[in-house]
Amino acid sequence: MRDPRDIIKRPVITERSMEMMAEKKYTFDVDVKSNKTEVKDALEAIFGVKVEKVNIMNYKPKAKRVGRHAGFTSRRRKAIVKLTADSKEIEIFQGV
């Protein structure tokens, strides 16, 4: 099994993700090779919470240019995690 901190990369802090926190939904960037079960197990191991549901979205790379040099952004994978009603909140989002 992989280390849980390799699966969960960073929290996503946007206006929409902050509004979803009232419904106990938290948003994270995750490893592109991870699946829903790995994301659930990693969050339960790192933060000690109970996960009810995991939704995952894939973002394709976008073409970008800097002057005459063209390239692509990195592909991303984002997970929206819903906690159970009796679960505690994730502390990483408290001061934001």
Swiss-Prot record:
User: From the Swiss-Prot or TrEMBL record, what is one GO molecular function term?
Assistant: rRNA binding
Please indicate which superkingdom the organism of origin belongs to. Answer: Bacteria
Show the Gene3D superfamilies listed in the entry: 3.30.70.330
- InterPro entries, from UniProt? Nucleotide-bd_a/b_plait_sf, Ribosomal_uL23-like, Ribosomal_uL23/eL15/eS24_sf, Ribosomal_uL23_CS
Answer yes or no on keyword Ribosomal protein.
yes
Can the keyword rRNA-binding be found in this entry's annotation?
yes
What's in the GO CC field? ribonucleoprotein complex; ribosome
GO BP, sorted A to Z? translation
Task: Give the record's keywords alphabetically.
Answer: Ribonucleoprotein, Ribosomal protein, RNA-binding, rRNA-binding
Q: Name one Pfam family in it.
A: Ribosomal_L23
Classification via SUPFAM superfamilies:
Ribosomal proteins S24e, L23 and L15e
Q: How does it assemble?
A: Part of the 50S ribosomal subunit. Contacts protein L29, and trigger factor when it is bound to the ribosome.
Q: Which family does it belong to?
A: Belongs to the universal ribosomal protein uL23 family.
Known function:
One of the early assembly proteins it binds 23S rRNA. One of the proteins that surrounds the polypeptide exit tunnel on the outside of the ribosome. Forms the main docking site for trigger factor binding to the ribosome.
- The name under which this protein is listed is Large ribosomal subunit protein uL23
